[in-house]
């Protein structure tokens, strides 16, 4: 039932007028099973996990996208097919590829600047959207994890796994980092965030010189606006600073980039969970992490 054929059968039963020949199951997406129809349509089926109500989050995502579709400066998915129970849906595929750091670095300076400025416009719009846009049927609104929650997960779930392949000094830096993260106070304001604005979800146009779209709003939540700037530090300090300056030109949130750096350091540590799948990238990450953590801890004692 969960394979490509089974999911395609569900699509045909729900939408008999939608003609397609090929259904391919994508292995991308931890929170959804994704089926690509004729390389033209993307259908997403939320996974149900213990402690999470992914179908409810999916319906909240659909409501948010419907609100953004006509006003966003960057294309977002437009769901043209939604099952009667709101349990799955499909949109016309946005042609593009993930904006990997190497592709971003290969662009002209003007193209990079234009992309960052458009993303700043997008974030201003998204962050000004009332959080009620993602409220579930009972009124609940998903919230970003606190630093203390990330610290507790590190201790309970992640530390022992990562300790197997990092040396003692680096592990000690990680422990100090998570304690610092847990001690971080609340942000000056909370907004509706994308929640997972990484290279996987920012698509470059086929010409690799502009943005084709932003996808996967399934982790949208109420949280720190700095969280949506996190991944841009993977494009370099200059890119993150440009985005922060365009997003907050009056400097009303002077700690914005510092909080993004903390979040980025946590993101880099979390990447070590994929060590076995990406040995070359992991070797480089292990070489970079001591300096990155020292820098973050020095800036955030």
Regions found by a protein language model. Name each.
Residues 21-145, 169, 187:
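ATP-binding pocket architecture of kinase catalytic cores
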């Amino acid at each position: 039932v969960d394979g490509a054929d089974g999911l395609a059968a569900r699509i045909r039963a729900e939408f008999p007028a939608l003609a397609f020949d090929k259904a391919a199951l994508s292995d991308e997406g931890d929170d959804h099973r994704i089926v690509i129809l004729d390389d033209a349509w993307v259908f997403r089926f939320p996974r149900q996990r213990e402690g999470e109500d992914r179908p409810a989050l999916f319906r909240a995502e659909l409501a948010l996208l419907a609100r953004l579709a006509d006003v966003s400066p960057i294309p977002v998915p437009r769901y043209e097919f939604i099952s009667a129970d709101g349990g799955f849906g499909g949109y016309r595929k946005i042609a593009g590829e993930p904006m990997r750091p190497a592709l971003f670095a290969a662009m002209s300076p003007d193209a990079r600047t234009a992309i960052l400025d458009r993303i700043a416009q997008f974030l201003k719009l998204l962050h000004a959207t009332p959080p009620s846009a993602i409220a579930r049927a009972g009124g609940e609104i998903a919230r970003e994890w606190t630093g203390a929650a990330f610290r507790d997960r590190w201790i309970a779930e992640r530390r022992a796994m990562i300790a197997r392949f990092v040396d003692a000094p680096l592990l000690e830096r990680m422990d100090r980092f998570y304690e610092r993260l847990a001690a971080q106070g609340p942000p000056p304001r909370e907004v509706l965030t994308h929640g997972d604005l990484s290279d996987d979800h920012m698509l470059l146009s086929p010409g690799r010189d502009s943005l084709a779209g932003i996808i996967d709003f399934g982790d949208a939540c109420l949280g720190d606006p700095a969280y949506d700037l996190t991944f841009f530090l993977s494009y370099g300090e200059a890119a993150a600073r440009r985005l922060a300056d365009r997003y907050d030109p009056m400097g009303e949130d002077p700690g914005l980039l510092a909080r993004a750096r903390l979040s980025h350091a946590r993101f880099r540590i979390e990447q070590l969970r994929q060590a076995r799948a990406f040995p070359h990238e992991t070797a480089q990450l292990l070489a970079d992490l001591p300096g990155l953590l020292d820098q973050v801890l020095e800036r955030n004692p």
